[in-house]
C-alpha cells in the first residue's frame, strides 16, 4: 500500500549535520541560495509522490524509501553525468548532495541500490504496459508549480529538436537478422526444441555459435546475401511452429522477418530489396524502438528529442515540454502536442511560437490557427515566382523579370479537391497548387519580419546544447524510447533548476542594490546640499 513520505523530517540532536560543522562550513551549508538548498526546495519538495502511487498496491507493498528522494537521485545522476556507483558514493558521503535530497541527519538512511533500480523498472514496465508516462507527468507537475511561483510568461514559446543516437552498435542487415533469430532460439526450452527437426536444430545451433561480424568480414557481398536465404526459411518455420508463444523475442523475430523478407504466392521466401525496407525498421535487436534518419550530413540510428520553452524578453524562461520519438518522425509531428502540453503546464494561451522551417506543414494550420507562427526559414529552394491571391484570382510575379501575370484557373486533378492555376511560359505551362501558394505566402511573411524577431528562436539552441552536453558523439547511454524520455525529462528538470538558481541570484542582487540606494539616498542628498 502506497504511503506519502513526511515532508518535514525531524532533526536528530546528535546526528544533525549543522551541529557538526564549523562556522564557515555551516554558513555555506545553511545558505538558502546555495544550489543544494535550492534543489531541495525547487525540485525535490515539488515532486508529487501520488503520481507514482499506481506502482504500489497491496501485492507490491509500500515503497521502502521516499519516492521524492529516489526521483531526486535520478535527476542528480543525469545532471552531473554520474555512473550509478558515483551516484551512490555522492549520496552517502557528500553532505551537499544529501542535503539536496532531504537527508539532513548523518544517520538518515539512503535508499539501497535494489530499491532505486526497482522503482526505475516499475516506471519502465508501467509505461510499456499502459503507455502512461509517469516521469513526463512529474516533469509537467514540477514545471507547472515553478511557472506559477516565478510568474513565467508562457504566451510566447520557441521549439527545436535534436537527433540522439541509441546505445547500439551499427549493425549490418545480416547481423540484425542473424542476432534476432538467435535471440529467439535461445529462449526456447528443451521441450520446445524437441519439436524441431534434427536438420533445423543443427542449423540453429550452428548459427547460435557463429559470430556474424566475422562472417561478414571474411565473406563477399554475394556470399552474405546467399546466407540470408536459408536464415529466412528457418525463421519462417519457427514463426509457423511457435506462433502460440507471442513473447517479446517472438514478436521481434516476426517483425524483423516481415521487414526483411516477403512470402510469395507459392509460399517461397524472398529477400526484400534494400529500397523496400523502411527507415523505421529494426536497427538493432537490442533496441527495437530506434529508427534510422539521414539529416544533412548526420546519420542517426536512434531518436529525436523536441524541446519547447517559454520565450519572454523579461523574467524567467523555462522548458515546458520535452518529447521523444523515433528518429524518422518529422519535426512537424511535434508542433500540436508540444503546444497543447505547454498550454496545460503554463495555464496560458500560446499567442506566438518561434520555430525553424522544418516545423511548418499544412497539417498544423488548424491547431495553429490563432497562433502567430514565426518560422525562421522555409524548407526547399525559393521559387522564381511570387504568388498572391487577390479578388481577381492568383497574381503571379516573376521575381527574375518583375513581370506580373494573372494566372488562369484550370481543371482540378483527378481525385483532388484543390484548385490549380497556370501561367504560360516560353517552355510551356507552369502550374501552381495550394501548397505552392501557401509556401509563397509564408516566405513573404518571413521577409516582412525584423531580424531581431527572427533571431529569437536561436536561443532555444542553447537549451538543445545543454540537453546534449553530456553525450559522447551524440549517443545516449540508454536504449529504448522510454529510457530516453526518462533521461530527457531529468536533463530538462536540471536545466530549469539552473535557470531558477541564476534568476534568484540576479533577483537578490537587484533587490540589494535597490534597497541600498533607497537607504543611502537621503544621506547623499543632504551631503550634496551641505557641499553646495
Label every model-predicted segment.
Residues 60-64, 78, 484:
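Short, solvent-exposed segments of well-ordered alpha helices
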Residues 71-81:
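Alpha-helical support elements that line or immediately flank enzyme active sites
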Residues 32-72:
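Basic, short loop/linker segments at the boundary and entry of helix-turn-helix/winged-helix-like folds
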Residues 51-57, 99-106:
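Short amphipathic helix-turn modules centered on a small-residue break
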Residues 95-97:
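General structural concept
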Residues 86, 91, 105, 109, ...:
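Anion-binding and metal-coordination hotspots
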Residues 1-32:
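N-terminal intrinsically disordered, low-complexity, charged/polar
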Amino acid at each position: 500500500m502506497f504511503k506519502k513520505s513526511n515532508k518535514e523530517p525531524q532533526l536528530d540532536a546528535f546526528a544533525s549535520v549543522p551541529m557538526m560543522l564549523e562556522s564557515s562550513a555551516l554558513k555555506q551549508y545553511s545558505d538558502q541560495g546555495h544550489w543544494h538548498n535550492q534543489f531541495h526546495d525547487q525540485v525535490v519538495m515539488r515532486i508529487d509522490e501520488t503520481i507514482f502511487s499506481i506502482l504500489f498496491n497491496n501485492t507490491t507493498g509500500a515503497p521502502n524509501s521516499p519516492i521524492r528522494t529516489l526521483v531526486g537521485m535520478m535527476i542528480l545522476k543525469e545532471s552531473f553525468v554520474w555512473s550509478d556507483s558515483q551516484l551512490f558514493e555522492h549520496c552517502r558521503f557528500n553532505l551537499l548532495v544529501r542535503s539536496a535530497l532531504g537527508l539532513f541527519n548523518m544517520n538518515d538512511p539512503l535508499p539501497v541500490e535494489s530499491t532505486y533500480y526497482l522503482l526505475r523498472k516499475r516506471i519502465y514496465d508501467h509505461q510499456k504496459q499502459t503507455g502512461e508516462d509517469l516521469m513526463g507527468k512529474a516533469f509537467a507537475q514540477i514545471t507547472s508549480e515553478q511557472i506559477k511561483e516565478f510568474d513565467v510568461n508562457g504566451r510566447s514559446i520557441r521549439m527545436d529538436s535534436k537527433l540522439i543516437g541509441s546505445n547500439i552498435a551499427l549493425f549490418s542487415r545480416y547481423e540484425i537478422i542473424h542476432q534476432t533469430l538467435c535471440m529467439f532460439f535461445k529462449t526456447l526450452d528443451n521441450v520446445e526444441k524437441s519439436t524441431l527437426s534434427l536438420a533445423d536444430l543443427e542449423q540453429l545451433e550452428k548459427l547460435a555459435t557463429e559470430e556474424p561480424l566475422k562472417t561478414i568480414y571474411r565473406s563477399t557481398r554475394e556470399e552474405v546475401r546467399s546466407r540470408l536465404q536459408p536464415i529466412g526459411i528457418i525463421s519462417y518455420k519457427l514463426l509457423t511452429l511457435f506462433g502460440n508463444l507471442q513473447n517479446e523475442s517472438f514478436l521481434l523475430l516476426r517483425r524483423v522477418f516481415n521487414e526483411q523478407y516477403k512470402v510469395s504466392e507459392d509460399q517461397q521466401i524472398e529477400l526484400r530489396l534494400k529500397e523496400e525496407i523502411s527507415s523505421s525498421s529494426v536497427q538493432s535487436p537490442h533496441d527495437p524502438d530506434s529508427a534510422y534518419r539521414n539529416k544533412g550530413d548526420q546519420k542517426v540510428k536512434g531518436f529525436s528529442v523536441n524541446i519547447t520553452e517559454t520565450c519572454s524578453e523579461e523574467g524567467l524562461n523555462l522548458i515546458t515540454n520535452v518529447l521523444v520519438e523515433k528518429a524518422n518522425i518529422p519535426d512537424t509531428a511535434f508542433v500540436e502536442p508540444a503546444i497543447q502540453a505547454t498550454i496545460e503546464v503554463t495555464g496560458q494561451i500560446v499567442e506566438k511560437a518561434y520555430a525553424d522551417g522544418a516545423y511548418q506543414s499544412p497539417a498544423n494550420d488548424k491547431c495553429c490557427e490563432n497562433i502567430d507562427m514565426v518560422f525562421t526559414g522555409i524548407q526547399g529552394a525559393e521559387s522564381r515566382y511570387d504568388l498572391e491571391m487577390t479578388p481577381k484570382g492568383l497574381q503571379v510575379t516573376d521575381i527574375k523579370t518583375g513581370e506580373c501575370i494573372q494566372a488562369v484557373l484550370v481543371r482540378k486533378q483527378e481525385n483532388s479537391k484543390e484548385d490549380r492555376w497556370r501561367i504560360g511560359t516560353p517552355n510551356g505551362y507552369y502550374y501552381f497548387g495550394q501548397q505552392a501558394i501557401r509556401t509563397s505566402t509564408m516566405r513573404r511573411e518571413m521577409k516582412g519580419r525584423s531580424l531581431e524577431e527572427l533571431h529569437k528562436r536561436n536561443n532555444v539552441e542553447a537549451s538543445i546544447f545543454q540537453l546534449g552536453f553530456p553525450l559522447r558523439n551524440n549517443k545516449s547511454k540508454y536504449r529504448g524510447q522510454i529510457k530516453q524520455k526518462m533521461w530527457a525529462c531529468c536533463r530538462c528538470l536540471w536545466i530549469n533548476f539552473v535557470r531558477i538558481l541564476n534568476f534568484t541570484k540576479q533577483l537578490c542582487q537587484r533587490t540589494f542594490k535597490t534597497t541600498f540606494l533607497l537607504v543611502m539616498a537621503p544621506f547623499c542628498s543632504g551631503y550634496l546640499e551641505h557641499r553646495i
